[in-house]
Amino acid sequence: GEVVGVLAEDWSMSEDGMVSTFQIKQGVKFSDGSDLTAEDVAKSILAVPVNLGQYNGSYGRLSTIIEDAVATDEYTVELHLTQPYYNTLRELCLANPFGIVSSEQFNDDLTAKQESFRSATYGTGPYMYAGDNDGQTWNFVRNPNYWGEAPEVDSFSIKYIPDNDAKILAMQNGEVDFLSGIKNVSAESYAQMEQTDGYGAQVDEKSLQTYYVGYNLSSEIFGDQVVREAISSAIDKDAVVDNIYGGLFDKADTFFSRDLPYCDVEQTVYGFD
């Protein structure tokens, strides 16, 4: 899809692909009332690999090739990379880990001020964090300093319910209004709610996730390619889709989802035999 600017009004990339320049929207405020500047954007970007630590790269390659992020003036940021990267813009669109927060929420070494992040949010979005209830329910309210059109809903809460049946019961009792994610709702529960009057159920047309089983190549058994091919041919993926996931999934014949850029490719796959 097309990249659409929100906090960035305009951007350009150098011919060698090593430097991206962003013009930051003026008049935007954080939830604490402070102004968004290029310095906040630069520091938020530089803080990503620092705070990810050993997990740096888990959310994409961009955070592993950042050389520097520089505020060249109050509303202009330059992102310098160690090498060109085709997916720079798309990865910057990921709120996790590239969400922009006030630079005041980082220590001098760019580590996050943990107590601040646990008690409040310092972003530019329409809502802000308003505390939790015993670590089970997290509450959010309208951001009074939001620069865009005010959201219709005054507040909302995210509730943690570990048991699948309890989630459905909570919805039926009116405790929750919305359940999301295949990990949060079983195929059976989805089918049940889909057929119940007064409820709606929807499956996204596109998915970026692939569920797979990987072979341990250091194993004496799975180190044999013939064994791996035999097992791959013995798995009826159509039956898995129908009987375990209620027909809600598409059969995966490639490691990456075909909905990802450049991944809709044809190749010879192992059929069920």
PLM features per residue range, with description:
Residues 1-15, 46, 122-123:
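N-terminal lobe/hinge region of extracytoplasmic solute-binding protein
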Residues 2, 93-151, 155:
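Gly/Pro-rich hinge or "lid" segments in bacterial periplasmic/extracellular proteins
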Residues 7-8, 34, 88-99, 124, ...:
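A structural "hinge/loop" feature
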Residues 12, 16, 23, 58-106:
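Surface-exposed binding/hinge segments that line
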Residues 28-34, 107-108, 146-149, 218-227, ...:
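Short helix-loop capping/hinge motifs at secondary-structure junctions, enriched
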Residues 33-35, 40, 165-177, 225-226:
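Short helices/loops that flank or line small-molecule/ion binding pockets
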Residues 68-70, 130-141, 157-219, 242:
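Extracellular/periplasmic solute-recognition and catalytic clefts
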Residues 251-273:
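Structural transition elements
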